[in-house]
Design a protein with these regions (language model features):
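Short beta-strand segments
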Residues: 22-58, 75
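Active-site-adjacent structural patch at catalytic or cofactor/ligand-binding sites
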Residues: 56-58, 69-77, 85-96
């Protein structure tokens, strides 16, 4: 990108730092040509090329239905401080559940250090499940004055 109004392409280390500083975004899913975006908390593991998240599911979860039918997900993470100061990162790839027994203790500890808490409203049973987004494509653009 050469036009400064459209920002600059971020380097890999800038993207990783931004993802782990923000640690929240919108996970975009699709089912029968319908899109569904959900706010999530995550931790980005550059060495493993993945974003890890601990998702909550209610009994009749629309989220689960969409996850089961989505081949490729998209995670959008952004910060907007003004028209001339913003950052946007998109992570796309396959999405799969991770058995909690397969997660090493240091990975879950790291997740809880990096990811931001999102409280789930009381009043129903919520089942927590680990998922990972395999980062097959990662891009970031930023504009600073």
């Amino acid at each position: 990108m050469t036009d400064p109004w459209y920002g600059h392409t971020m380097a890999s280390d800038e993207v990783t730092q931004f993802l782990n500083e923000q640690a929240t975004g919108v996970l975009c899913l699709a089912h029968e040509q319908r899109a569904y975006g959900i706010p999530i908390s995550f931790a980005y593991d550059e060495d493993g090329d993945r974003a890890i998240m601990d998702l909550g599911f209610a009994e009749d979860s629309k989220k689960r239905e969409f996850i089961e039918t989505t081949d490729e997900v998209c995670l959008t993470v952004y910060e907007w401080d003004g028209p001339h100061e913003w950052t946007s990162v998109v992570v796309s790839g396959s999405f799969e559940p991770v058995d909690e027994d397969d997660l090493e203790e240091d990975v879950t500890a790291w997740y809880h250090r990096v990811a931001k808490d999102i409280d789930v409203a009381a009043g129903g049973d919520v089942e927590l499940e680990w998922y990972q987004l395999h980062a097959e494509e990662v891009s970031g653009v930023a504009l600073y004055e």
